[in-house]
Amino acid sequence: MIACASCSHVLKILESATVMEVKMAEVNRPDVIAGRELTNTFDIDAINYYDLQIITHDFIKNVLLSSPCIHNQIPDTLIQLAENTCRKILLNLSNVLSDEELKEERIRVWEIHDSQASSYERNFTQLILGGLIDEEQFTDTLENCATVSDILLPTFFNVYKLCGEELCKKYLEFLVNHPTLRKYRIEHV
């Protein structure tokens, strides 16, 4: 049973992805391999809300929106939605946009997602939704039903479904090199 309303967001994300922790050892898809590499390199579950939002913002802005496969397949209205999401993430982190306003935007974008017929557009919109989680929802989700890994790792699956192995590898490279993740690097002895 869902312990809190915010858990439903994570459950929706997980619906479209495999249960990576159970299958990671036996699956050799590029998204699972990338997820395994990420969790072997960083303490993903230690990532805080602010850092996750910065990473999500930078991914949408610098990787997702610059990918050629996006511009060939995604309508301009969704590109604008992604750009708007980037602005809203930063406004929320600087306390200009309230958590309530971010929550309203998340509901609006979920409605767009649910009305889309194209799975390609739905995958793209689902990646955008990752940036529209407010801090209270993030905290509730972690306290009641998920880990940061449960939130972050399905992104690899959505990236893989959207543009294949090439973008999946770019996403991993982006994460491994992101300055925010340095402090979460696992020191292997």
Which sequence ranges carry the predicted segments?
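Structured binding/interaction patches within domain cores
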Residues: 2-189
